[in-house]
A protein has these predicted regions:
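Short aromatic-glycine-(Arg/Gly/Cys) micro-motifs in beta-strand/loop hairpins
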Residues: 1-22
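Generic "edge-of-domain/loop-turn" microfeature
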Residues: 13-15, 31, 73, 87
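Hydrophobic/aromatic beta-strand elements that line small-molecule binding cavities or substrate pockets
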Residues: 24-25, 55
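A short, charged, amphipathic alpha-helix used as a generic interaction element across diverse proteins
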Residues: 27-51
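Short, mixed-charge low-complexity intrinsically disordered segments
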Residues: 43-100
Length: 100
């Protein structure tokens, strides 16, 4: 059975590096992991923009992209990715949800 990482990449608007965030892990099929990620994308409330006017969600090859337009004219991009775990140096344990 495969283990899938549901990741969020939220690069800073000014090009500063921000680490990816592990939203959840799913053991099972790619389809079940995609369904879980799809639901997380729909429920995700980004911290920016503070006053969102419009949110668009696009399907990509490995997940989804969310573009949020703010009231002041800025746009913020969020990339949600589905990644299959290939190797883990830690103990084999139960998947843990880190996104609430």
């Amino acid at each position: 059975m495969a283990r899938w990482g549901l990741l969020l990449d939220n690069p800073d608007r000014h090009g500063e590096y921000r680490p990816m965030e592990l939203l959840d892990t799913v053991d099972g099929t790619r389809e079940s992991a995609e369904a879980q990620l799809r639901e997380l994308v729909r429920l995700y409330l980004p911290s920016r923009p503070r006053k969102p006017k419009r949110t668009r969600i696009y399907r990509t090859a490995d997940g989804w992209a969310m573009i949020c337009d703010g009231a002041a004219g800025q746009s913020f991009a969020y990339r949600f990715m589905l990644c299959e775990l290939e190797w883990d140096s830690g103990p084999a344990d139960e998947p843990k949800t880190v996104w609430q």
